[in-house]
């Protein structure tokens, strides 16, 4: 599949602190890529770099097949940004503006703006066009950003914690919108989120970042369908590690007060060989925890 977004070696430092460390990232057409990591790991900084909102020390961003960064000329910016819908982690609109005025400003900024589509999303999200931005909760501000992001018919959505502050029903509604968006295989979504259960519902690929460095990039189904968390005692871990069932380097462990949790790459193979060892399906949150804090078996 064609990559609508490609980041190659993105590096950014502030003084002695490296906030992006040779970040590689790709978002193919027709896909939803989930972007996970702890607060301060580099998710928001990466998205800002993709949007050309900050200079980089090294690396490059390629959007829709052409290089793009903060120094791109006005024509390139208009052409590329016109194909991107963005939802940032904080609402960027002037607090004293009404929703209707926000729509008017967006119409002036985007030649492809569709007022009818904007109004449709306002109704869907129950946003009163007469209200001012400052009257909205965090969740309502996210809905307003999403309505704006969709109303100019972009090809890519870059969403930074777009479901934060939403109740479960509203989150499911947003996920339905994203599924519909990528049903057009010329579209794609990059979604950063701490709500990993949302990503388990819709993502195709999960990318993890820690301390500015990409630490994994895997198909979501590999994590949630194939991997498992084995609940072992010390003797069982020794048997498992020495069995030859897995490459020992592929096993990671977390030592708990009640025993040892082991991340295994194939829970079905474990069940066949060691049926006496309890094993649960892995979640994205499990996998991230093992990668960041687990030990090699």
Please identify what each model-predicted range represents.
Residues 175-264:
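ABC transporter nucleotide-binding domain
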Residues 2, 184, 246-248, 271-274:
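Short, well-ordered coil/turn elements that cap or connect secondary structure elements
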Residues 2-7, 12-197, 201-210, 215:
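ABC transporter nucleotide-binding domains
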Residues 29, 234, 266-268:
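Non-catalytic surface loops within mature trypsin-like serine protease
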Residues 1-2, 297:
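Short, Lys/Arg-enriched, disordered terminal segments
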Residues 157-158, 237-240, 268-272:
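Short, surface-exposed beta-strand/loop "edge" segments at domain boundaries and coil↔beta transitions
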Residues 250-297:
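C-terminal coupling/interaction segments
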Residues 98, 219, 280-283:
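Short loop/turn segments at beta->alpha junctions
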């Amino acid at each position: 599949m064609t990559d609508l977004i490609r980041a190659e070696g993105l590096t950014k430092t502030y003084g002695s602190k490296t906030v992006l460390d040779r970040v590689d990232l790709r978002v193919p057409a027709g896909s939803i890529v989930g972007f996970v990591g702890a607060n301060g790991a580099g998710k928001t900084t990466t998205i800002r770099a993709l949007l050309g909102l900050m200079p980089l020390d090294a690396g490059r961003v390629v959007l829709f097949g052409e290089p793009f960064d903060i120094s791109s000329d006005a024509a390139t910016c208009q052409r590329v940004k016109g194909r991107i819908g963005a939802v940032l982690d904080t609402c960027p609109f002037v607090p004293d503006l009404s929703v209707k005025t926000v729509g008017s400003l967006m119409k002036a900024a985007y030649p492809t703006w569709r007022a009818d589509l904007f109004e449709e999303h306002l109704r869907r999200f129950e946003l009163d066009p007469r209200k001012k931005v400052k009257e909205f909760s965090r969740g309502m501000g996210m809905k307003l950003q999403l309505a704006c992001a969709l109303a100019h018919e972009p090809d890519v959505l870059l969403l930074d914690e777009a479901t934060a502050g939403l109740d479960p029903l509203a989150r499911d509604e947003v996920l339905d919108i994203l599924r519909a968006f990528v049903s057009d295989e010329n579209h794609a979504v990059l979604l950063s989120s701490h709500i990993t259960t949302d990503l388990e519902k819709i993502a195709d690929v999960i990318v993890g970042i820690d301390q500015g460095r990409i630490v994994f990039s895997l198909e979501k189904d590999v994590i949630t369908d194939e991997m498992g968390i084995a609940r072992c005692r010390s003797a069982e871990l020794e048997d498992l590690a020495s069995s030859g069932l897995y490459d020992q380097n592929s096993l990671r462990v977390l030592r708990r007060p009640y025993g040892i949790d082991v991340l295994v790459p194939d829970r079905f193979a474990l069940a066949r060989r060691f049926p006496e060892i309890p094993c649960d399906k892995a979640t994205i949150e499990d996998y991230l925890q093992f990668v960041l804090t687990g030990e090699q078996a």
